[in-house]
Amino acid sequence: MNVSFGILAYNESDSIGTTLESLFQQSLFTETDSSYAIEILVVPNGCTDETAKISRVTLDKLVKQSAHANVSWQVCEVEQPGKSNAWNRYVHDFSNPAADYLFLMDADIQFLEPDTLRNMIHALETTPEAWVSTDIPVKDVALKDKKNVIERLSVSVSKDVQSRERWASICGQLYCARAAMLRKIWMPVGLPSQDGFIRMMVITAGFTSPMNCQRVVLAKPASHKFEAYINLHSLLAHEKGQVMGNRINNWIYSYLRDNCNQEQDAGSLIKRLNDENPLWLRQLIQKTIAEKGWWLLPQGYAFRRFKRLQGQPLQKIISKFPVTITAFLADLVVAVQVNQELHKTGGLGYYWGKKG
């Protein structure tokens, strides 16, 4: 079995070494298993620090020390910054054409279970209808016994396990996919939010079939941790990027629904548009904004957290109210800022999109 890891990195010199060390502590690397041929490709994109250099030094050391005898590695530097472009280059240009499975990873995560990677592969091996397997992303502050208000707010906006299973969520920090299926997908150049876009391409087969959430499976037990935003400014900036990215994605979905069919799926259409007119996404967004008018976000967005309290016991409502009202005020600020930013810039190039 051929397994490829694509680690997409943007100025991660402070974290890439720790992430690679955590990767090599996985049972996939610590146990001798001749049935796996593994490649690790780090893709620094637009980096201005020593991410590439540290990756080379660390990988050279770890591969020599690994119990697994069939591990290869390469650092593939990309001059143009942007996660979407780096994703396209890894999936379609850099990864082993013979790979059975592709892992996409961020460069600033650490694994919590030693068998996370094996279990993610196993989930696909035992679920024929699934294209992608995921794990549970855990914010580092969620592991703390005592949390301040901002940390509680950060944890509260994370989806629970049941929600991830119900909505077939994909976290771009880590997922495993059947290579043949993932290679049907192309990212629009400049796309600011990738997670939801990948999910939609998978569950609709590139807008050629009805939604099928069974194409995404949650591996168990499997999880990783990542550094959460713990100050108000960074938390708001992150939420702003997420909301903006989701809104842009919805506009793209509308365009793809109108233009995709059995003869032309979303992947082939996007590849053609990227090649013929790299500015097509910007032009689509500008056209959509002109048609929408002043307010661009869904009605009632800022009040969504209060709806979650409906039907809850009074005691639970009281206990959650301080966090809910804080989150509401944050949502209100984010909504206004996102609306302004979309009118001003179209939202492209705003957010690299590492953390959740």
Q: Which residues are covered by each model-predicted region?
A:
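A conserved acidic beta->alpha catalytic loop
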Residues: 41-57, 80, 109-110
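Short beta-strand-to-loop acidic/aromatic patch adjacent to the donor-nucleotide binding site
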Residues: 98-110
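Active-site nucleotide-sugar/metal-binding loop of Leloir-type enzymes
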Residues: 85-101
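A short, conserved alpha-helix in the catalytic core of glycosyltransferases
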Residues: 181, 191-221
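Short, acidic, metal-binding catalytic loop of nucleotide-sugar glycosyltransferases
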Residues: 21-37, 61
